[in-house]
Amino acid sequence: MEIAAEMSPLGDRPVSRRRLWIGLVVSIALCLGAGGLGAALTTPEINGWYRTIAKPAWNPPDWIFGPVWSTLYVMMAIAAWLVWKPAGLRAAAAPLALFGVQLVLNMAWSWIFFLLHRPGWAFVEIVLLWGAIVATMVAFLKRSKVAGMLLVPYLAWVSFASVLNFTIWRLNA
């Protein structure tokens, strides 16, 4: 068995490279799966309800959202993995719990905005999401500077999405 330089959460045994790679794959699958659940509700509404509502002139083209979100989900997954990797799940429980909260809020936004057609409610929810991302970034930065910095593009995109959400809400109120 090939041994990595990483130690177990208790520091008593080395962790195999295989386990580290499996952790990364699981992290990526979890994040992309969460994104897929949100997209499953979003996609049918892009050509339906979303086409019929007023949007600002600076609204990005629909095709840009898939690649941007896919990239962000992979970056989020790597960040979570970097927090989990050196210490394990028990030792990183608090920052990973925050990560889980923001991931659930991320999915919930799609449901509220696209499935329920409630831009006002979605705006309140995305503000909560923004706060959860900031809290996750702070917790991640304490464990890994790289992990925290990997969430910066996500925070920037959600900041933009918040302004877009607010504008759509006001245009259609």
List each model region and its residues:
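Short, Lys/Arg-rich, polar N-terminal cytosolic tail immediately upstream
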Residues: 1-19
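N-terminal signal-anchor transmembrane alpha helix
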Residues: 14-41
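Membrane-interface helix termini and inter-helical loops of multi-pass transporters
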Residues: 44-57, 171
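Membrane-interface loop-to-helix entry segments
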Residues: 59-75, 116-129
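Helix-adjacent hinge/juxtasegments
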Residues: 74-110
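Membrane-interface helix caps and helix-loop-helix hairpins in membrane proteins
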Residues: 111-121, 169-173
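Membrane-helix boundary connector in multi-pass membrane proteins
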Residues: 113-119, 135-148
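Terminal transmembrane helical module of multi-pass membrane proteins
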Residues: 139-173
